[in-house]
Amino acid sequence: MCIIAIKKAGVRFPDITTVETMCDSNPDGFALVYHDTQDGKARTYRTMDREQFLRHYKSVLRSHDFRTTNLFLHARIATHGSLRRENCHGFVDKKCHLSFAHNGILYSIPNRGDLTDSETFFRDYFIPVFRHGGWFEADRLIRDVIGYSKFVFMDNKGNIRHYGDYIKDADGMLYSNSSFRRHPYSYYLKG
């Protein structure tokens, strides 16, 4: 059902082992959305390749200061839509300067071809409401559809808004579920 990890400025980056665990538990596509403090813009990186994703994440760790960097990661388990890069979260609307990821299933959003329920919500519901009424109206829409899901948005200035109940670890990281933890029995599952 996917996982979102949110790191706000001042919180240390999640370690590589944690990110690897997220990817192993949710292997159907990966995204990293971060505020690039060097040029002041939000960047979105999406891939189907776990190793490419981890390499890109490590390069962000080396080139960005945890004290000033906001980011979120998303690892996908496909429930709607096929396994392809375009269905990886970190959906972007360039006119609104927003990136979006979702964890859960949006039961009230109808299937639209090969799109995920997340992309359908973002593109066909959220963006029109946001363009019309800003965050005030968008918050109302989110409350109406979120259920047990989790959402995260980042604007082009690196501001993060998140919705739903997240797990907060001792370091201040937020996770949408526990699939970032290596479970004690996982050793036996690797055949």
What name fits each language-model region?
Residues 52, 64-65, 69, 73-75, ...:
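Regulatory input/activation interfaces that engage signals or partners
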Residues 107-168:
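Short histidine
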